[in-house]
Amino acid sequence: MTNPVVAIVGRPNVGKSTIFNRIVGERISIVEDVPGVTRDRIYSSAEWLNHKFYLIDTGGIDIGDEPLLVQIRQQAEIAIDEADVIIFMVNGRDGVTAADEEVAKILHRSNKPVVLAVNKIDNPEMRDLIYDFYALGFGDPYPISGSHGTGLGDLLDAVARHFPKRGQEEYEEDVIKFCLIGRPNVGKSSLVNAILGEERVIVSDIAGTTRDAVDTTFVREGQEYVIIDTAGMRKRGKIYESTEKYSVLRALKAIERSDVVLVVLNAEEGIIEQDKKIAGYAHEAGRGVIIVVNKWDAIEKDDKTLIEFERKIRDHFPFLDYAPIIFVSAKTKQRLHKLLPLVRMVSENHAMRVQTNVLNEVIMDAVAMNPTPTHNGRRLKIYYMTQVAVKPPTFVVFVNDPELMHFSYERFLENRIRDAFGFEGTPIKIIARPRK
């Protein structure tokens, strides 16, 4: 089950972005630790009392030169489409405006839970201003102050009460779940159709967090697979065309529910910055990754074309150096027969466990080959390493002082682990801890 989505909706200048930043806090910059990966500020992950959720700020959308009420209406409709819970924000100092009433009408039709937040109630004397807003028909309004941060706890408590209860896992453990992500026109839908071929497709309406997330289940060579959110690849209404950023949110939710992510590139168009961002989402999420170059039939080739394209990919995505690359054509079916075996291999690597004694033989050999670094006259000592998790494989290495573990030495250890055990297609995490 994915984390729920909360959208902040309201007319311009009611303080949506301020509240967004208040709720998100410091988390907005965390994602920028990954080299070459930046994230649009329109949405972020957030947490309140152990409830993790995505927060989207509809005010971050620029819908162009449309009249103001049309823009507000479009933003509200996008939020309704994507969100599990909606924070409807109004400005307490302005009273109820015609634009507020317009948004309220749309939200009433949505059947989504709505929590009404009255912003700019900056001191207790102003609380009486909230009573006019009962007329909007959303029950008790919550007084908040974006500038002071007051009232947010009560507001988030009310929001969290509407979160769906966490159920059991949607699919059996041995089912391989994968998704295809990529910018528009890279051929995701045609790839899905080519993978499925003429087989009878069992479309199961598994409730994701959106009403229209449809997963496609099929069996190939005795292995059950699920392509996550095939509906998301086909759904492109007018609003989505004008607000491309929202397809990112759908991709994030699909990634979260997948074991393996296929990052799809368009061979004809080459690699652009947006591809890098999209690939970064899969890497950050710790999923298995395969880079799929589609439309390979459409470009003129000589004996160097494939090698040069592969080098370009490695240059653009240094953080995905573990991901295999496959060149395919959904149209001519070129190399498509190799895709599912690759998905299966990466899924197995993503869930692989290594015995502690075998792992430590590799680590001790690595240290003998390349002694540990020193800092200010102190040398890093490695006592032992153990694997603590899978999906992705996560290792804890016990040392005398974690501060002495330089990232380049950590990288060296990761490469030795990969040389010994494979792990193609999956990120590896190494955490240095002091020995108690």
Curated annotation (Swiss-Prot):
Transmembrane segments: none
Top-level taxon of origin: Bacteria
Keyword Nucleotide-binding: yes
Any one GO molecular function term: ribosome binding
UniProt keyword annotation of Phosphoprotein present: no
Domain EngA-type G span(s) in chain numbering: 4-167, 176-351
Signal peptide: none
Residue sites binding GTP 1 per the record: 10-17, 57-61, 119-122
InterPro entries, alphabetized: G_ENGA, GTP-bd, GTPase_Der, KH_dom-like, KH_dom-like_a/b, P-loop_NTPase, Small_GTP-bd
UniProt keyword terms in alphabetical order: GTP-binding, Nucleotide-binding, Repeat, Ribosome biogenesis
Annotated GTP 2 binding sites: 182-189, 229-233, 294-297
Ranges where the KH-like domain occurs: 352-436
GO biological-process terms attached to the record: ribosome biogenesis
Role noted for this protein: GTPase that plays an essential role in the late steps of ribosome biogenesis.
Assembly with partners or alone: Associates with the 50S ribosomal subunit.
UniProt record similarity statement: Belongs to the TRAFAC class TrmE-Era-EngA-EngB-Septin-like GTPase superfamily. EngA (Der) GTPase family.
Name the UniProt record assigns to this protein: GTPase Der
